[in-house]
């Protein structure tokens, strides 16, 4: 069993912890929090040993009825690998600790590529991970882009990508962020950071991205245009998506035309935390013009799509499963991830 420490038990960390616990070849040996919070109570309910950075705060946790297993360094020493799910920028500060302890670690998309030196996506570059001490799972938006670009590049070749990210303003529980009544260019200059982030995994892809933030919390929405190298049809493209375990199709017959309706659908499916781990490509939007111009809309659940990637990254870094498709199958099966549509 791979012993996994989750350093940072927040939006991503709590999901990765549950995903690790569901795997047949992994176990959660601890999670970390900096202060008493709702997530700390969830960790207690899940039975995850809770570690804190500052043992001076231990009385506050104990007063709240939450047992502290020790400090974060003790958790790290007991682990085979660390998933660093701390806020953006904190992972960079944590890296020297992992280096000192000789631990493999996975960072999230909030960190720069240079923090790990290797950015990861299970379908695109799984086999390149094994000889690295560190890896970075690209951001939620970049994960969604890499999945769909890589799938079409493998099938038809991709000459060029132009994509617009319509980004949610905040996560549902993040009451400190906005906007409440505005559309904010993010940034006003072109490109946004998403294209260069995609290039850390798919360096050969010509991609330009634009982004804006809107007053919603449920998901991001992408408007994507690709120039393909080979002529194809809409039907052939849909077959590629149907055969991809992490690209779901929002069928026209579902009547879903918004992120809110899609979230309701995942809730009705009984998905944990209403998570959409896969891309949600709107079938009705999938178009091929003049044989080589591809268009679509896709929804990306910012809290969830990187979760299975973290699980595969654990196996890839540890070298325990050599075949990417086998790891992906194991991860999906344990999570109950059957792509919608």
Swiss-Prot record:
* Major place of residence: cytoplasm
Annotated Pfam families: DapB_N, Gp_dh_C
Q: What is this protein called?
A: Glyceraldehyde-3-phosphate dehydrogenase
What does the entry list as the binding residues for NAD(+)?
11-12, 110, 168, 302
Catalytic activity line of the entry: D-glyceraldehyde 3-phosphate + phosphate + NADP(+) = (2R)-3-phospho-glyceroyl phosphate + NADPH + H(+); D-glyceraldehyde 3-phosphate + phosphate + NAD(+) = (2R)-3-phospho-glyceroyl phosphate + NADH + H(+)
Recorded GO cellular component terms are: cytoplasm
Which Gene Ontology molecular function entries are recorded, alphabetically? 4-hydroxy-tetrahydrodipicolinate reductase; glyceraldehyde-3-phosphate dehydrogenase (NAD+) (phosphorylating) activity; glyceraldehyde-3-phosphate dehydrogenase (NADP+) (phosphorylating) activity; NAD binding; NADP binding
Q: Binding residues for D-glyceraldehyde 3-phosphate, per the UniProt record? A: 139-141, 194-195
Compartment annotation:
Cytoplasm
| Listed InterPro entries | DapB_N, GlycerAld/Erythrose_P_DH, GlycerAld_3-P_DH_cat, GlycerAld_3-P_DH_NAD(P)-bd, Glyceraldehyde-3-P_DH_2_arc, NAD(P)-bd_dom_sf
| Taxonomic lineage from the root | Archaea, Methanobacteriati, Methanobacteriota, Stenosarchaea group, Methanomicrobia
Q: Which GO terms describe its biological process?
A: glycolytic process; lysine biosynthetic process via diaminopimelate
Against SMART domains, the record matches this protein to:
Gp_dh_N
């Amino acid at each position: 069993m791979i012993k996994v420490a989750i350093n940072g038990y927040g939006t991503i960390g709590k999901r990765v912890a549950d995903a690790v616990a569901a795997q047949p070849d992994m176990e959660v040996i601890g999670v970390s929090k900096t202060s008493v919070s709702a997530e700390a109570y969830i960790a207690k309910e899940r039975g995850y040993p809770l570690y804190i950075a500052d043992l001076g705060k231990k009385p506050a946790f104990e007063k709240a009825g939450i047992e502290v297993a020790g400090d974060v360094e003790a958790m790290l020493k007991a682990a085979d690998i660390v998933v660093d799910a701390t806020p953006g920028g904190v992972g960079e500060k944590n890296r020297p600790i992992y280096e000192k302890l000789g631990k493999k670690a996975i960072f999230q998309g909030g960190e720069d590529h240079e923090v790990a030196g290797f950015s990861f996506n299970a379908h695109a570059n799984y086999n390149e991970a094994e000889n690295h001490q560190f890896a970075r799972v690209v951001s939620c938006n970049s994960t969604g882009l890499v999945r769909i670009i890589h799938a079409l590049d493998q099938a038809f070749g991709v000459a060029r990508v132009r994509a617009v990210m319509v980004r949610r303003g905040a996560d549902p529980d993040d009451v400190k962020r906005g906007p409440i009544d505005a559309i904010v260019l993010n940034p006003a200059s072109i490109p946004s950071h998403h294209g260069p982030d995609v290039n850390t995994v798919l360096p050969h892809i010509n991609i330009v991205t634009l982004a804006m933030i809107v007053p919603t919390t449920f998901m991001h929405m992408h408007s994507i245009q690709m120039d393909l190298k080979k002529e194809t049809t809409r039907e052939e493209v849909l077959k590629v998506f149907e055969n991809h375990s992490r690209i779901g199709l929002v069928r026209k017959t579902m009547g879903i035309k918004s992120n809110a309706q899609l979230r309701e659908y995942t809730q009705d499916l009984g998905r944990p935390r209403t998570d959409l781990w896969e891309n949600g490509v709107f079938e009705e939007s999938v178009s091929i013009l003049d044989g080589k111009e591809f268009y679509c809309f896709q929804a990306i659940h910012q809290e969830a799509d990187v979760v299975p990637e973290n699980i595969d990254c654990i196996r890839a870094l540890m070298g325990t499963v050599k075949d990417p498709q086998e790891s992906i199958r194991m991860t999906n099966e344990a999570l109950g991830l059957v792509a919608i549509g």
